[in-house]
Every structure is written in C-alpha cells, then in structure tokens.
Regions:
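A structural signal for short, well-ordered beta-strand segments
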Residues: 28-30, 60-62, 137-141
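Active-site region of the double-stranded beta-helix
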Residues: 21, 47-54, 63-73, 81
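Non-catalytic surface loops within mature trypsin-like serine protease
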Residues: 34, 64-66, 141-143
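Non-heme Fe(II)/2-oxoglutarate
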Residues: 121-122, 126-187
Length: 187
C-alpha cells in the first residue's frame, strides 16, 4: 500500500503536472509530534534538497491525523511564487528579517488531506499544545531527469546523522541538511 501510494501511477501523474515531467521519489518520512512536542523553525527545503545536484522539488504532505493550530499544523507563508532562497541563518533556517517579512497561514487538515508545495515555499509549524499526537507523512519528489537519488540520500543521511540506536558515545552528530528547522536537541 505504501509503495503504491508514493510511487503509483495516480500519484506520479499528479506530481508530473507540478514538475512538468515524470517525478521521482527523493525521500519520505513520517513526523510524529507528540503532545508537548516542539515545532519546526521557519525554513525552505530547497537549500537542503539541492545537495544531490537537483534544483526543484515538490513535497506531498498527507495528514494521518487532524492538523490544527493547537497541535502544531503546517504553516506556510503567503507569498508570490519564489524560485530562490530567502535570507537564512547558518543552520539553514530563515533569518529573523525573512520571517518578519512574511505573512503566515496555518494549513489545518483532516486525516487523508493532501497538501502539495514546492521546495521554495517558506514553512514552519508550532509546538503541539494539545493532548493528542499529530502524525504527518511527507514525501518529496524531484524531476526524473534530475536523477534517482533516493538510495544515496538515505545512505548519506545514515552516515552523518544515524538513528539513535546506531550512534557512538562521545561523537557529535550534526543534522546539517538532513533536519533543517528540526527542534530536536542533538547530543
């Protein structure tokens, strides 16, 4: 079911309309935001996603649970179409000046709702102030002519930012491009 959802013809045909050619799955993840979980700082995905030589991506967000302002739903900036990166901090989050110059809109969703946005859309989310978890599936696609880098992406991510169970004591892991805006503290 998962493969058909992310890489089936129905989904790829929809994404082809947005990237103007066949799309290739670049990466996917599920974000779990537990009650009290922190939000994600304002950022654009493009600076992180270009590390494999690609320039443009479209992300599909599928709500597993209801997304509300109380549980930290996605917020996007209301802006004209961007095709460049805004002013950023060293950690690739948007600078205070960039954030202050944007008008933010919460994207409240019901389970099963899809939200599609490209890699230049500024976005963020607030903390989960509710007493229920909020889960969201994110799948990011690039133009097929830019190449299939999914395996390389996850190999490199595991090398520089391994799961907790694979980390060695005393080693400092820097999330870098693999967790832009992520509120998780790294030890």
């Amino acid at each position: 079911v998962y493969a058909e959802l992310l890489q089936g013809n129905a989904n790829l045909n929809l994404l082809a309309l947005l990237v103007n050619e066949r799309a290739a799955l670049f990466k996917e993840k599920i974000n779990f935001k537990l009650p009290g979980g922190q939000g994600f700082s304002a950022h654009q995905d493009a600076p992180a996603f270009t590390s494999f030589g690609q320039r443009f991506h479209v992300t599909m967000m599928l709500s597993i649970d209801q997304g509300t302002t109380d549980n930290g739903c996605l917020e996007i900036a209301r802006t004209s179409r961007l095709d460049n990166s805004l002013d950023m901090n060293e950690d690739l989050t948007l600078s205070d000046n960039a954030v202050a110059g944007l008008r933010w809109m919460p994207v409240e969703t019901a389970p099963g709702d899809l939200v599609l946005f490209d890699s230049y859309v500024p976005h963020r989310s607030a903390a989960n102030f509710s007493d229920v978890s909020r889960r969201v599936l994110y799948a990011t696609y690039n133009r097929a002519t830019d190449g299939d880098f999914r395996t390389q992406y996850f190999t490199e991510k595991r090398r520089v930012f391994p799961p907790d169970v694979e980390r060695r004591e005393g080693v400092q892991y820097d999330a870098g491009v693999f967790n832009v805006g992520n509120p998780v503290a790294f030890e």
